[in-house]
UniProtKB/Swiss-Prot annotation:
This is Filarial antigen Av33. The keyword Disulfide bond applies. GO terms for molecular function: aspartic-type endopeptidase inhibitor activity. Keywords: Aspartic protease inhibitor, Disulfide bond, Protease inhibitor, Secreted, Signal. One of its GO terms (cellular component) is extracellular region. Residues 211-220 have a biased composition (Low complexity). Aspartyl protease inhibitor.
């Protein structure tokens, strides 16, 4: 069990190494069901913040939109809590039942509730952060730590947009590569589930033995070159 876990962690670490070594990453978020923090958009006394940075005061229309979002968000959290509890109980029953495979299939087919739509005043342009060596860019503004430096020029904004497109393609390639490595190590999703829940179902085992994992080749996607909006001194 410990060996398999280590193999999985090593696989992910190696495949993600290129991104980490280049010292750049992209982050975007709008927290609905989490425990809080400054990630994504935050509203305090009708003041809008994005990832900890103050943006502006909400308009009267945006305040009404925000009130509706809060109501829908609270409803979503309650529905999610109920749904997760149902799944937890289902997993317990599946582990003790001879029909565990069928029960697990029923659980996974039932969709979790969908979170409410984000308010119009909280967009990807507001919350997406680009971390480079020495600085961060958000909403076309350069920050060093928490200090605002300046706005990007028109040419720099175009360069950042091009970087975003290339980084998105690279992240998709990386994610696909990780999934292929996981499949080659553990087989299909059901087998991986059994490894970590100690659920050993005969029908699943027989099906996995008869399954051959196809090998696919992907055209490698290189990590994009980092924009030089700031230059750190080592």
């Amino acid at each position: 069990m410990k060996i398999l876990s280590c193999l999985l962690l090593c696989t992910i670490t190696v495949l993600e190494g290129n991104v980490m070594n280049r010292h750049n990453k992209r982050f975007a978020g709008f927290n609905v069901a989490g425990i809080g923090g400054t990630a994504g958009c935050v509203v305090v006394d009708n003041k809008l913040f994005a990832n900890g940075f103050f943006l502006r005061e909400l308009t009267a229309e945006e305040q009404r939109e925000f009130a509706q979002y809060v109501e829908e968000s609270n409803k979503y959290k309650e529905e999610l809590k109920v749904s997760l509890e149902e799944r937890r109980k289902g997993w317990q029953i599946a582990r003790q039942s001879e029909k565990g495979a069928k029960i697990l299939s029923t659980i996974t087919e039932k969709n979790l509730p969908k979170p409410p739509k984000k308010p119009s005043f909280c967009t990807a342009a507001d919350t997406t952060q680009y971390y480079f060596d020495g600085c961060m860019v958000q909403n076309n503004k350069i920050f060093v730590g928490q200090s605002y430096v300046r706005d990007l020029t028109a040419d720099e904004a175009k360069e950042l947009k091009s970087f975003d497109v290339k980084m998105t393609a690279y992240q998709k390639y990386l994610s696909s590569s990780i999934q292929q490595q996981m499949n080659s190590l553990f087989g299909d999703k059901t087998n991986l589930l059994n490894l970590f829940t100690n659920t050993h179902l005969e029908s699943t085992s027989q099906a996995s033995e008869a399954t051959t994992i196809p090998t696919t080749t992907q055209t490698p996607v290189e990590a994009p070159e980092t924009p030089s909006f700031c230059v750190p001194i080592y």
